[in-house]
Amino acid sequence: MNKQVVAKRYASALFEIAKEQQLLDQLEQELRVVKQVFAQNETLLSVLNHPKIALAKKKALVQEAFANISTVLQHTLMLLLDRHRIDIVNDLADAFIALANEARGVAEAIVYSARPLTEDETNALADVFAKKVGVDTLRITNIIDKDVIGGVKVRIGNRIFDGSVSGKLARLQRQLTR
């Protein structure tokens, strides 16, 4: 079965538990930390996936590495180890965050700009694009991209709104070459 499909099932179950126990915000933050730890330490995932390392050692390693997270998330990680599914932890985190955002009416956006955006510019973009995509709140991550030249390019999910100078130039070039 596809890793993302499996991850969505685990994320859905974890999401229901989080709602029942009112741990939605806490688990979302903890999953972001877990995802970051796995991203920064690629050897951790390879050790946890290694077939010759005993399951007890893997569990001890996870308990030590993530001692400060909630027991619900620790149990989820142990379950993933038991079922040899620890490699889906990043997909699980992404799916859980998407479910949590959907429940709150929040979307995540990446804004590419030639320079760092001010807080006022970020808030203005969040207000405008939140209405366009039909959410209450838009969380913006600003990425500096000198290729943008000017303006901004906004990515929300799989939708891209390109108001950048480079995007306008590319569209103009396509029109002129037809």
Swiss-Prot record:
Assembly notes: F-type ATPases have 2 components, F(1) - the catalytic core - and F(0) - the membrane proton channel. F(1) has five subunits: alpha(3), beta(3), gamma(1), delta(1), epsilon(1). F(0) has three main subunits: a(1), b(2) and c(10-14). The alpha and beta chains form an alternating ring which encloses part of the gamma chain. F(1) is attached to F(0) by a central stalk formed by the gamma and epsilon chains, while a peripheral stalk is formed by the delta and b chains.
Protein name per UniProt: ATP synthase subunit delta
Record-level GO cellular component terms: plasma membrane; proton-transporting ATP synthase complex
Gene transcribed to yield this protein: atpH
Cited PROSITE patterns: ATPASE_DELTA
GO molecular function, one term: proton-transporting ATP synthase activity, rotational mechanism
Keywords in alphabetical order: ATP synthesis, Cell membrane, CF(1), Hydrogen ion transport, Ion transport, Membrane, Transport
Role, per record: F(1)F(0) ATP synthase produces ATP from ADP in the presence of a proton or sodium gradient. F-type ATPases consist of two structural domains, F(1) containing the extramembraneous catalytic core and F(0) containing the membrane proton channel, linked together by a central stalk and a peripheral stalk. During catalysis, ATP synthesis in the catalytic domain of F(1) is coupled via a rotary mechanism of the central stalk subunits to proton translocation.
